[in-house]
């Protein structure tokens, strides 16, 4: 990789389920500090693409190169990879039988990254950052959807990731809770975190992202800065899509 700022490179990525090709020869790069919004119609492959980046979906063929290492090669330490590439899911994926603090500290302690004391301290620091320091001893079912998603963000940050992946992080939330999650994501973006976000939030994509990517039928059909993407789209399919969602 010639550009020293490139943290992630995707080459000829394909993913097939049975005989259905979901991703068709995806090629892109991600630079450190970029915030990339991935937009597209349902079933276009955008979530499959995102999940491939930390091997939650194993590519059928192609290469994902993170900091010079090809993640598609045999013998890749997936646990180590997921420390570096954090993930926030649509449905939070918190452990219901654990307190909020335990949800955050579990992985760093189990993987030997921190002592219990260090992990507890980090969890409280992160809960303060997402505005939930008073919920450390609560359980997930005591929290609203927006609060659960803020905890999920804190949990991902506890691993000190280089990249954060967000898979439609607000789409399962009641409308009045969307803002509290987006504000945390905006703060993360402003802090320099590299973020790749599959989203239906066009305002976030326009205002916060440095790049917008339109995936359609398993291909990247448009990839540009937000102003060009929204104001002068080149792809006819993107123009049609935006006319329906804006």
Enumerate the language-model features and the residues they cover.
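ABC family nucleotide-binding domain
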Residues: 5-226
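C-terminal boundary and immediately downstream tail of ABC-type ATPase nucleotide-binding domains
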Residues: 214-217, 221-223, 227-246
């Amino acid at each position: 990789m010639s550009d020293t700022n490139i943290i992630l490179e995707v080459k000829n990525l394909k993913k097939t389920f049975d005989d259905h090709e979901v991703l068709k020869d995806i090629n892109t790069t991600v630079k450190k500090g970029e915030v990339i919004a991935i937009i597209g119609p349902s079933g276009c492959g955008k979530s499959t693409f995102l999940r491939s980046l930390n091997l939650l979906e194993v590519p059928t063929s192609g290469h994902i190169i993170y900091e010079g290492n090809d993640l598609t090669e045999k013998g890749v330490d997936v646990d180590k990879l997921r420390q570096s590439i954090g993930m926030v899911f649509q449905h939070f994926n918190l452990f219901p039988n654990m307190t909020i603090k335990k949800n955050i500290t579990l992985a760093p302690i189990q993987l030997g990254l921190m002592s219990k004391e260090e992990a507890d301290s980090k969890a409280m620091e992160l809960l303060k950052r997402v505005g939930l320091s008073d919920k450390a001893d609560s359980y997930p079912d005591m929290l609203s959807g927006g609060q659960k998603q803020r905890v999920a963000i804190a949990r991902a940050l506890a691993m000190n990731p280089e990249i954060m992946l967000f898979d439609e992080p607000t789409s399962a939330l009641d409308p009045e809770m969307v803002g509290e999650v987006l504000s945390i994501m905006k703060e993360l973006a402003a802090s320099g975190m590299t973020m790749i976000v599959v989203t239906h939030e066009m305002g976030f994509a326009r205002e916060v992202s440095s790049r917008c990517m339109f995936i359609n039928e398993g291909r990247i059909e448009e990839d540009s800065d937000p102003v060009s993407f929204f104001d002068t789209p080149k792809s006819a399919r993107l123009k049609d899509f935006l006319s329906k969602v804006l």
